[in-house]
């Protein structure tokens, strides 16, 4: 992929004003920032901790891709990333990232990254980088037709609207208060948010507009891909829960693997539509697929993830 300039996004940052003099996105300055220790060896800190009190998988993926990208030349860019989460991460301990240069070719280069804590691997991945190659072989699906982000409530306003509803189901109220207490470095606007007055089974599909908070800029396509890795894991596996939340509650849920394919240049600090669906769940696992669309209809990234999901029956309020 080439640098993400001239993307054909007529909206660009028009809805944000000129942010070039604003603080750089915290995703760049802190969350995905790595300390070099030796050749192909880096240390990551500054971890965002979700309510699970484990490391957020998107941050580990993003940092691993940052480390891998530092070992390739400027003219090659990631086109695929395949990851396994092998142990739960400890948010109190730095993560060491070791990059192995598997192959450096004329067109493609492959890097393996191992993330280590307490002397053991918690995460492994392989990333493949490609030099830009024009080709007549081109097609893509069509982007879903949805309202633009300017017409939708942001995540904070939507949660506030839900919480002000006196008919909101108790289960949702507890979960929304927990989410509202978190500070995340991304902005989200949900498309067609459901009503939450009662527990209900929903279709295993969701869509939301998403972008990094703050300014990243145009020039560094590698960093935009690393930020997309972070973004892609947010609320992704939860898509598989939507048909079952009326009868069950989560006992344990964690990502097992995650794959990404990068198709076209994009800016992660511009709005992108994240289209998520779960085609299958079973055997205490759920499978989710996702597509990140640019506003001009270009398919930028495709994602897939499988995770472990262990449920327990929902206790009805009449039995309490």
From Swiss-Prot:
Domain of life the protein comes from: Eukaryota
Alphabetized InterPro entries for the sequence: ACOT8-like_C, Acyl-CoA_hotdog, Acyl_CoA_thio, HotDog_dom_sf, TesB_ACOT8-like_N
Active-site residues, record numbering mapped to chain: 233, 255, 305
The EC number(s) this enzyme carries: 3.1.2.1, 3.1.2.11, 3.1.2.2, 3.1.2.3
Microbody targeting signal, short sequence motif: residues: 318-320
Expressed in which tissues: Ubiquitous.
Location within or outside the cell: Peroxisome matrix
Enzyme class: hydrolase
Keyword Membrane: no
This protein's record includes keyword Lipid metabolism: yes
Pathway: Lipid metabolism; fatty acid metabolism
Function (record text): Catalyzes the hydrolysis of acyl-CoAs into free fatty acids and coenzyme A (CoASH), regulating their respective intracellular levels. Displays no strong substrate specificity with respect to the carboxylic acid moiety of Acyl-CoAs. Hydrolyzes medium length (C2 to C20) straight-chain, saturated and unsaturated acyl-CoAS but is inactive towards substrates with longer aliphatic chains. Moreover, it catalyzes the hydrolysis of CoA esters of bile acids, such as choloyl-CoA and chenodeoxycholoyl-CoA and competes with bile acid CoA:amino acid N-acyltransferase (BAAT).
Protein name: Acyl-coenzyme A thioesterase 8
Annotated source species: Mus musculus (Mouse)
